[in-house]
Amino acid sequence: MGGVFGVASKSSCTMDLFFGIDYHSHLGTRRGGMAVYGPNGFNRSIHNIENSPFRTKFERDVEELEGNLGIGCISDMEPQPLLIQSHLGSFAITTVGKINNEEELVREAYANGHIHFMEMSGGRINATELVAALINQKDSLVEGLQYVHEKIDGSMTVLLLAPEASTPPGTGWAAPRCSSEKRGGLLCLLRELRIYQPGLQ
């Protein structure tokens, strides 16, 4: 299990993000993480919460994390959110789910080009990093999220934070097999693809 939470605000989102993630603490017992975007770019904090509550581990980080856009998670598996820099720009990403065809997707990623993954304990690959690698195979974040939706066998919720979300040429926000909304600076892939962009209600 696990839980994700995101905030898009006109002012500081840090306290809302902190309490929103803490509310999900019952969904996981291993890792907690927060990532915010503000005037100084991205800032992130991840802690092990196996032996102490989320609030205790993150109460000092709240003073240093400044921004009006933020995502975070409680995770039973991999440390996240991850900060990614690629040809699509910089973004933060967090996921919750189970990828049944993970080995197949990793083999395809290796076959498609020069790519590597950070290895976790026990030889496992961070599923969130795999999702980011799938997104980065396309020409826009929107197309990448749609590709994730098509490729993953299993259950996957993706919360993605990008300073600016670009759309592929000629497609607008509506695309086959997905519905879209625009809100804040968060891109979210649920059962249907929902897209959120800054500055729109």
Annotate each language-model stretch with its function.
Residues M1-Q201:
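Conserved short alpha-helical segments that host acidic/polar catalytic motifs at enzyme active sites
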